[in-house]
């Protein structure tokens, strides 16, 4: 994804459904350096904004103003499968099944943790 043009459907969706690091910093009450450390440690999913240095944090990884409990395990599973945060974002926003409207991120929000982890382990198709 990082080599794709900035004006693709994936990037438009990313910008539309994500929180900026400055907004998230204020919301969580931590500085942006701490956010970066959390992202590097695998506690948050952050995707670099196309052509920039800032990161965008998909809103679906948060519940009640905090990261969902599954996020660290999700990131760890993705890394074990060889996926970086950009590819993890792509996988999480793929449609589930043939012709389905739900995305894997919808399953995360619905608490279907095992289905989400299984899809991420496969590295692509939910």
Segments predicted by a language model, with ranges:
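Non-transmembrane "mature" sequence context
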Residues: 1-126
């Amino acid at each position: 994804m990082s080599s794709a043009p900035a004006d693709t459907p994936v990037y438009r969706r990313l910008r539309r459904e994500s929180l900026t690091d400055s907004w998230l910093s204020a919301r969580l009450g931590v500085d942006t350096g701490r956010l970066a450390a959390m992202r590097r440690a695998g506690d948050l999913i952050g995707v670099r904004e196309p052509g920039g240095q800032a990161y965008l944090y998909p809103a679906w990884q948060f519940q009640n103003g905090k990261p969902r409990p599954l996020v660290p395990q999700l990131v760890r599973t993705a890394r074990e499968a060889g996926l970086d945060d950009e590819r993890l974002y792509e996988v999480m926003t793929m449609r589930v099944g043939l012709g389905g409207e739900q995305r894997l991120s919808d399953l995360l929000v619905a608490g279907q943790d095992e289905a989400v982890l299984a899809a991420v382990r496969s590295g692509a198709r939910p």
